[in-house]
Amino acid sequence: MFYEFALIGTTASGKSSFSIELAKEIEAVILSLDSLCLYKNIDIASAKPNKNELSIIKHFGINLVYPDSHFCVGDFIKEYHKAKEFAISKNCPLIITGGSGFYLKSMLKGLSPKLEKIKIELNNDEIWSIAEKIDPNFTSKFSKNDEFRLHKWYQIYKLTNEIPTNWLVKNTSAPTIQNLKIYELNWDKEELKNRIKNRTKIMLNSGLIDEAKKLFTTYPKDIKALKSIGLKECGEYFEAKLGDIKSKEAILNLENLISIHTIQLAKKQRTFNSGAFKDRIILDTKSLKVKHFLDKYLNL
């Protein structure tokens, strides 16, 4: 029977392994909700499911494009439709899982039209002052420290001469998905930090530096994919910014830097998920088992 649900969580929360175990039990297919797994040749840095796992469970959203290719939310939505059509044709469930919550939010909320970029001539305080006067709905929901949204708001304001919140209501497309159950794997902060540090060690021991070296010699170092956590730090390592690349100190500095940046990312993901998916069901990872999840939440 076809049905779909999402399994989200921060990086290193165990989403991939748990979703694969679930998929085995309910004979589901998986749509990867990860902005790095979609790239070919980025396997270790993305913590991508291994070849054996990919052979056992049908995955979508993985190995779609090369690292120097453009990929946007619209492309991801097309991949979602492919995954859904396949699941319906096989009469099986679809599990949507990963850490790129922006993709999921875009499918649930709809997409706004793409606007041309303009030069931002005002500082953030000046833009915020305008927003406070004409668009209190915006300022009540967001912070003036959220530069991305603030600049997008100003961009809409300048290009349309309308109040941005009103313009978005009129011009945002209908949601791609409605009434989706969302489950979040939740870890204690200190436990998650330890998981991140352990995963970083595993990635380095599995050949992260060699993978990164091939990527940096194949593609321009300024492409988006090579600025991802795990790869950008390797770029600094190759440039001897972390010490002599032949020294153990440089490796330890690399490991520490990746862990720090990953912990910071996890904090941002947790904050994003709590704001974007208020109806999500939070799962206690300490007692979480596949059978328990199936019994309690899917009634299987």
Swiss-Prot record:
UniProt xrefs under Pfam families: IPPT
Cofactor(s) this protein cannot do without: Mg(2+)
Region (Interaction with substrate tRNA): 34-37
Binding site for ATP: 9-16
Keywords annotated in UniProt: ATP-binding, Magnesium, Nucleotide-binding, Transferase, tRNA processing
GO molecular function, one term: tRNA dimethylallyltransferase activity
The keyword Transferase is annotated on this UniProt entry: yes
GO biological process: tRNA modification
EC number: 2.5.1.75
Binding locations of substrate: 11-16
Site (Interaction with substrate tRNA) location in chain: 100
Subunit structure: Monomer.
Function: Catalyzes the transfer of a dimethylallyl group onto the adenine at position 37 in tRNAs that read codons beginning with uridine, leading to the formation of N6-(dimethylallyl)adenosine (i(6)A).
HAMAP family linked: IPP_trans
Family, per entry: Belongs to the IPP transferase family.
Protein's recorded name: tRNA dimethylallyltransferase
Species annotation: Campylobacter fetus subsp. fetus (strain 82-40)
Designated gene of the protein: miaA
